[in-house]
């Protein structure tokens, strides 16, 4: 018989994930169906989102190989029935206090930084780049981890060195760029552009650097269709684009600059977002989401 979730101690919770203690060496990482936008956790969940994020992470952990935090299969007996398919047994690590972001294309906060300074996180870039420009080479653009509700703050490589030391900072940069190079080639072969992604690492008891948290999911990455790609315009993406677009439209009646809570999402936006997440998983993995462990919503 599987344990119940309340038999584990709740250790921490974020915008999307919750962490529970299994024993001294293992944790239960649970991905919820919560969705966040513009630093708000919305009141309307996206059915199956937690399962998609978990399936995508497991897929890419297997593709990448190497050292990661997984400590059990997706149907591990230690996973409670109520979170089966959206929870993983992972090793307990000393997490590195840096968001390891890598960008192969210019968009989002990177574009804002570039337009203001000609650089992103202190990395100088050529003149004349526009929205969605491919960068000459992928760049490591780290961020400090923010508290729930706050923005992650872009930092320079020198600031990473100040936080964790030269040796670990260099290893973080090298490992992040390596993951991006392999994952972007993998995605490109499937007609998908991996514009950027955010990784997290931890240290095990032996001081070894371990890839952790989620990896290459639609929440932590920008995926664009290769077909129709054109620099100079905003690209359609395989994530919560429908949610962001609706929240900033007149239909929502919500003012992003206000301190008010965003309204509930209409059913058609929920359905479209769920379908987009599943499409991302199936196109990139080549697998059917129907075959993933756990009950479908």
UniProtKB/Swiss-Prot annotation:
- The keyword ATP-binding is annotated on this UniProt entry: yes
Q: Origin, by domain of life?
A: Bacteria
Gene3D superfamilies annotated for this entry?
A: ATP-grasp fold, B domain, Phosphorylase Kinase, domain 1
This enzyme catalyses:
5-amino-1-(5-phospho-D-ribosyl)imidazole-4-carboxylate + L-aspartate + ATP = (2S)-2-[5-amino-1-(5-phospho-beta-D-ribosyl)imidazole-4-carboxamido]succinate + ADP + phosphate + 2 H(+)
Annotated SUPFAM superfamilies: SAICAR synthase-like (SSF56104)
Instruction: List the keywords (alphabetical).
Output: ATP-binding, Ligase, Nucleotide-binding, Purine biosynthesis
Q: Fetch the Pfam families from UniProt.
A: SAICAR_synt (PF01259)
Top enzyme class: ligase
| Record carries keyword Nucleotide-binding | yes
Q: In which pathway does it act?
A: Purine metabolism; IMP biosynthesis via de novo pathway; 5-amino-1-(5-phospho-D-ribosyl)imidazole-4-carboxamide from 5-amino-1-(5-phospho-D-ribosyl)imidazole-4-carboxylate: step 1/2
EC number(s) recorded for this UniProt protein:
6.3.2.6
- Annotated Gene Ontology cellular component terms: cytoplasm
Question: Mind listing the GO molecular function terms for this protein?
Answer: ATP binding; phosphoribosylaminoimidazolesuccinocarboxamide synthase activity
**What GO terms describe the biological role, i.e. biological process, of this protein?**
'de novo' IMP biosynthetic process
| Similarity comment text for this entry | Belongs to the SAICAR synthetase family.
For this entry, the protein name equals Phosphoribosylaminoimidazole-succinocarboxamide synthase
| Gene name in the database record | purC
């Amino acid at each position: 018989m599987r344990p119940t979730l309340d038999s584990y101690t709740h250790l921490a919770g974020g915008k999307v994930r919750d962490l529970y203690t299994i024993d001294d060496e293992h944790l239960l990482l649970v991905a919820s169906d919560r969705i966040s936008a513009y630093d708000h956790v919305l009141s309307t969940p996206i059915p199956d989102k937690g399962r998609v994020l978990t399936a995508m992470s497991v897929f890419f952990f297997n593709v990448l190989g190497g050292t990661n935090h997984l400590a059990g299969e997706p149907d591990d007996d230690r996973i409670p029935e109520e979170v089966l398919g959206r929870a993983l047994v992972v090793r307990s690590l000393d997490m590195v206090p840096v968001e390891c972001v890598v960008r192969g294309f210019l968009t989002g906060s990177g574009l804002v930084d570039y337009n203001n300074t000609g650089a992103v996180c202190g990395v100088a870039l050529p003149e004349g780049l526009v929205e969605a420009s491919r960068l000459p080479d992928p760049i490591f653009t780290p961020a400090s981890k923010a508290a729930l509700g706050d923005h992650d703050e872009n930092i320079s490589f020198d600031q990473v060195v100040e936080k964790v030391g030269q040796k670990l900072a260099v290893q973080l940069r090298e490992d992040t760029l390596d993951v991006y190079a392999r994952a972007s080639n993998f995605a490109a072969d499937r007609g998908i552009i991996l514009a950027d992604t955010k990784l997290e690492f931890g240290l095990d008891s032996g001081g070894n650097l371990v890839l952790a948290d989620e990896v290459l999911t639609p929440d932590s990455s920008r995926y664009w269709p290769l077909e129709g790609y054109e620099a100079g315009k905003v690209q359609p993406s395989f994530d919560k684009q429908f949610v962001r677009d609706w929240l900033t439209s007149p239909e929502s009646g919500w003012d992003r600059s206000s301190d008010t809570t965003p309204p509930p999402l209409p059913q058609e936006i929920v359905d479209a977002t769920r379908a987009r997440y599943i499409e991302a998983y199936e196109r990139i993995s080549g697998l059917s989401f129907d075959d993933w462990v756990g009950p479908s919503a």
